[in-house]
Amino acid sequence: KGQIFIDMLSHPTIRKFIDMLLGEDYLLSSHSANIVKPGSVAMRLHTDQWWMPTPTRRERQPLPAGSMNRERFDVDEVPSTMIAPRVAANVLWVLEPFSEDNGGTLIVPGSHLYGRQPDSDAASVVATAPEGTALVLDGRTWHGTGANVSDGTRQAILTTFCTPQFRPQENYCLGTDESVLAKAGPDLLALFGYKIWNAYGRIESPMAEFVRPDEDIVRELYPDQ
């Protein structure tokens, strides 16, 4: 809600990290404030790509991917040496210092390679950081907001990106103001989901590079037309 938040999306250092983690094409999944108030309890450990099906045995019948939700995952009882690829990445912009007392983010180091959903009793560490820090996480990392037992708030901005095969948390094609779209360049339009990816997301021609909300579409045709 403002140019400063749009400018954050083109921060060169951050974008280099996201390019490295996700590749040439990716979408903005969410871009929002995270304010932890005094008395807030710790969040349950989670990943930012919990919806990603995990590898399973050929002879096993897995839970259909469309039946997964935040409380119901597919779990193969036989451990696998294979893990799901990284398809999401998260940026935590530290607006107020992160500490052990004010809700600094809890992280389980190395958990991005575990290949499973978080254990509730996993040992975590607090990502302490000064104001002005940006913390970049692999989307598979087990993490969660810590408890705020201090007298002050802990403010941050959370920005999540995902690869174009997946559905973003926020629908920027419908939720972006026209004034923002009118000034948006190719990079921002691609982040918002207006770029056609390998013929996916098109309205008419799969050869077009971008779609626009005001694009003319072919409507019902009649024999006399």
Where are these regions (language model features)?
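Non-heme Fe(II)-dependent double-stranded beta-helix
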Residues: 1-69
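Short, well-ordered beta-to-alpha junction loops that form the rim of enzyme active sites
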Residues: 31-33, 94, 110, 139-140
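Catalytic core of non-heme Fe(II) oxygenases with the double-stranded beta-helix
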Residues: 41-129, 167-175
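A structural signal for short, well-ordered beta-strand segments
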Residues: 31-33, 91-93, 157-161
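Aromatic-acidic/polar surface patches that form glycan- and anion
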Residues: 3-10, 84, 127-128, 150
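Conserved double-stranded beta-helix
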Residues: 112-136, 140-141, 146-225
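Non-catalytic surface loops within mature trypsin-like serine protease
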Residues: 37, 95-97, 161-163
